[in-house]
Amino acid sequence: MASFKLATDLPEWKKLEETYKSVGEKFSVRDAFAKDPKRFEEFSWIYKNYDDSKILFDFSKNLVNKEILDQLVTLAKEAGVEKLRDAMFAGDHINTTEDRAVYHVALRNRALRKMPVDGKDTAQEVDDVLKHMKEFSDSIRDGSWTGYTGKSITDVVNIGIGGSDLGPVMVTEALKAYSKPGLNVHFISNIDGTHTAETLKNLNPETTLFLIASKTFTTAETITNATSAKNWFLATAKDSKHIAKHFAALSTNEKEVVAFGIDAKNMFGFESWVGGRYSVWSAIGLSVAIYIGFENFNDFLKGAEAMDQHFLTTPLENNIPVIGGLLSVWYNNFFGAQTHLVVPFDQYLHRFPAYLQQLSMESNGKSVTRANVFTNYQTGTILFGEPATNAQHSFFQLVHQGTKLIPADFILAAQSHNPIEKNLHQRMLASNFFAQSEALMVGKDEAKVKAEGATGGLVPHKEFSGNRPTTSILAQKITPATLGSLIAYYEHLTFTEGAIWNINSFDQWGVELGKVLAKVIGKELDDKKAVATHDASTNGLINQFKEWEE
């Protein structure tokens, strides 16, 4: 338990409020660069991965100077970021509302360090699951695992929702360059029957493997979709004994798994200390291991492990994810920014913003502190994004000339997996990556607009205020190790935010109420009687649905 109730009680928070009024509110990044030729060197860090690959994190275009950053670091120390971080890595129950450890970092403990939780070491248990995943994924990839007619598997369908879907979807898309030709992965998450129907309509039951991803094996959407998939399969296979060759479970509920018809040998478990939004590192990542191969999946884990060690051992003033989190707090709580933009200049990363939405907004979308009092300050930001250059032709107008401050992260790899046309496409992509962050910073003033020939009432329409903050993240190449490090960077950034706001970033009570009400309404939809048990709007909507349903 932190020693403070509210972040606003911290002495450094009050000092930062004064600093914002005296310096931050009028801070000019352009002027800061003009005054300090070494600003880029002072506010950028090169992260070195376990395989010697590198990622450059450039924070120099943000609205801070050294004094402000020093104050933010002091705030982190006062808030106990280091203490909470160390408690997480020690396996303590920092998820206080559910009395659980938060130990996803143990899932990528490839150095097999001692990482006990509740008096039990996790290293061997995690390694055993990974060995099982390797054996299974290798057998799918080499064709030795066959379906009920003796044919090799060509299509793997992961059925899950939330963290059991978003992580595997994002990672398989991001690492598609490492996939095996002829082996495809598909994902079903939405309870909308269209998602299941469209996914299955071109698949062959004889060569399809289903992975049912549900920790409890009772998640309503997942089990409904899984049952529909089983019925689709049995319509061709006929005999339920064939389920064993075509279904595996990523779950901890052996009783329900076996009752479904899945062989217990094809069940891959994980512990209660694995939160859904952090579960891609666990057995939930089996679809990833099958798609890109276990060695690449292991590199993915090791990349995350390397960022974990950086976060755990690096002083806060040079700690890359901590700095990212501190900047987020600075904009959110002192500038009043409500959103954060993430733009990957990489088509393979097109699902990365959606993945980060869950990580950030489910973790820090809280209004009660760990001291059980309501906050008197903003917490979780609204995170959004799309890949560039597409994004430049949609919402970048608002980012450049709108009335809202939208801090942004831009992500680019120097080396493309597809350097077509003598790398012309990648150089064009890179030129936009560099140009957008520069344009957001420098803007365009009235004099320059007039110098370019604009006159009269057109002039203000072509002005750009600039001074819009960006963080540029430049990797050498998007490899499994690089992606692992990038995800872990955002995990620990999110952790830092939550620690400063003194909220529990590891529960998600907000998703429960709607699910409970949906069960009640689901029963009401089973008959044709008009309902009158809700508010007038909900009654009206339900009754109109019943009238139009058939």
Swiss-Prot record:
PANTHER family xrefs: GLUCOSE-6-PHOSPHATE ISOMERASE (PTHR11469:SF1)
Alphabetized NCBIfam families for the sequence: PRK00179.1 (NF001211)
Subcellular location: Cytoplasm
Single GO MF descriptor: carbohydrate derivative binding
Name used for this protein in its record: Glucose-6-phosphate isomerase
Binding site for D-glucose 6-phosphate: 163-164, 214-219, 358, 362, 393, 515
Enzyme Commission no: 5.3.1.9
